[in-house]
Regions:
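Carbohydrate-associated surface elements
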Residues: 39, 141, 162
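Acidic donor-binding loop of glycosyltransferase active sites
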Residues: 262-280, 295
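Conserved donor-binding/catalytic core segment of Leloir-type glycosyltransferases
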Residues: 4, 186-202, 208-212
Length: 374
């Protein structure tokens, strides 16, 4: 069965969802789907390199209006599609019930959580989801939120974000030492790495406070923070005021990220809920990237983070990620027991390969869409 993917979020546009869709769909048979998406700088060259068919609208954004319904129906007929796949559920998914063909919806997280908690938008979202043939959810968390919005069970396949386990892998001792040297990190540091956008929901301030609490008893502790964002100046000021053992690395290139993960003793992101639960962690691909590098993880209990980190097996999930003392205790639990940390790192790597390899996930996606044989 051939399908047409309709989305605003597709490469060469850069972002987490764009990367996720690319990693999923580029592994499907190229004759099993086509893509309708919005224009973007450099798209012509990118599209020409692909084995599958891509069309782009003149309008900068795909919105749910009658013209879009006609555009989707026309392209679906032209490419011989049997199914439409809409990403995201809102607002683009509103065209679904008016299409000539059955439609599936892709769900990621925030675009389900926020509308699902507000009465009018919950009703609209529920209508789109109930009319869909099938739902592809990027984790159990958005799947549960979808059924809450729909008011009933839905036909859902969970296809979580994945990780390139060839690109992200454990480092040999010599590689680890060289990576630390390249990042300017002492070889004997008890290194806690945190990589993400610097925004309040990610909990960097709690990690900084926890590191400050441990500084006197663990003089070799270092928290290395990589990334940029609107919270950076506040976080720098907090680290300075607490005399916390923190180093801000700025934005690290994608090529260097596996080396930064791999030279850590543990990875931490204390993600947390905000605005009464309207803002939560969708899944947390950074935890999978750390796991693929054989590094244990410390996560805040928010949204899908507890799916990404298997508590007590691949890392630790902190139930109260706003509490620096609870976070400090989790850090010490890993640093005080290197054997346990190594076991968790090895278990994380094995799980990443077994459950979160993009090849495995793309096969699950393709089967759910009828693009592959069962």
């Amino acid at each position: 069965m051939k399908h047409l993917l309709v989305t605003n979020d597709f490469p060469p546009k850069i972002g987490g969802i764009q990367s996720l869709l690319w990693e999923w769909w580029r592994r499907l048979p190229p004759d099993s789907f086509a893509v309708l998406t919005s224009p973007y700088a450099g798209a012509a060259a990118f599209d020409a390199e692909q084995a599958f068919h891509i069309e782009r609208t003149r309008e900068p954004v795909l919105l749910p209006h009658p013209w879009m319904v006609q555009r989707i129906n026309t392209m679906a007929r032209d490419v011989g599609a049997d199914l439409i796949v809409l990403d995201p559920a809102l607002p683009l998914g509103l065209v679904g019930p008016s299409l000539d063909l059955p439609y599936d919806v892709v769900l990621h997280g925030a675009e389900v959580t926020v509308p699902g908690r507000l009465p009018l938008s919950k009703q609209t979202l529920g209508y789109v989801l109930r009319r869909a043939r099938h739902i592809v959810a990027a984790g159990g968390y958005p799947a549960a939120e979808a059924e809450h919005a729909a008011g009933r069970a839905l036909p859902i396949t969970v296809v979580p974000p994945g990780v390139d386990t060839d690109r992200s892998h454990p480092l040999a001792d010599s590689e680890r030492a060289q990576a630390r040297a390249d990042f300017g990190i002492p070889d004997d540091a008890e290194l806690l790495v945190s990589i993400s956008r610097l925004v309040p929901r990610k909990g960097f301030d709690t990690a900084i406070r926890a590191a400050a609490l441990l500084h006197s008893s663990r003089p070799r502790l270092l928290l290395a923070i990589a990334g940029g964002g609107r919270d950076e100046q506040r976080l720098r000021g907090l680290a300075t005021s607490l005399d916390a053992p923190v180093r801000f690395l700025g934005r690290v290139s994608n090529d260097d990220l596996p080396r930064l993960y791999g030279c850590a003793d543990a990875y931490a992101m204390l993600c947390r809920n905000r605005w009464g639960g309207l803002e939560q962690e969708g899944f947390g691909i950074v935890f999978l990237e750390a796991a693929a590098c054989g590094v244990p993880q410390i996560a805040g209990d928010s949204g899908g983070a507890a799916e990404a980190v298997d508590h007590g097996v691949t890392g630790l999930v902190v139930r109260h990620p706003d509490d620096p003392r609870e976070v400090a205790a989790a850090i010490e639990a890993l640093l005080d027991d290197p054997a346990q940390a190594r076991r968790m790192g090895a278990a994380g790597r094995e799980r990443a390969v077994r459950e979160f390899s993009y090849d495995v996930l793309a096969h699950r996606l393709g089967t759910s869409l009828g693009a592959l044989a069962d």
